[in-house]
From Swiss-Prot:
The keyword Ribonucleoprotein applies. Keywords: Ribonucleoprotein, Ribosomal protein. This is Large ribosomal subunit protein bL35. The keyword Ribonucleoprotein applies. One of its GO terms (molecular function) is structural constituent of ribosome. PANTHER family: 54S RIBOSOMAL PROTEIN BL35M, LARGE RIBOSOMAL SUBUNIT PROTEIN BL35M. It comes from Thermodesulfovibrio yellowstonii (strain ATCC 51303 / DSM 11347 / YP87). The gene is rpmI. Signal peptide: none annotated.
């Protein structure tokens, strides 16, 4: 069986913790921030955990991070 290729875009966007959780950045934090309340932008700084329904798809994209 050939080697699996890592999806380079996914590799840059997702990090895997020591316990195997997949973490991601939150959306709506790249531009047009002046119209958003500071409370919202502050909460968008927090790293979020990927939902369990997406785990299988992301594991196929980044097979060697586990």
């Amino acid at each position: 069986m050939p080697k699996l290729k890592t999806h380079r875009g996914a590799a840059k966007r997702f990090k895997v913790t020591g316990t195997g959780k997949i973490m991601r950045r939150r959306a709506n934090k790249s531009h047009l921030l002046t119209g958003k309340p500071s409370k919202r932008t502050r909460h968008l700084r927090q790293i979020a955990q990927v939902d369990e329904t997406q785990y299988k798809a992301i594991r196929m994209l980044i097979p060697y991070k586990f």
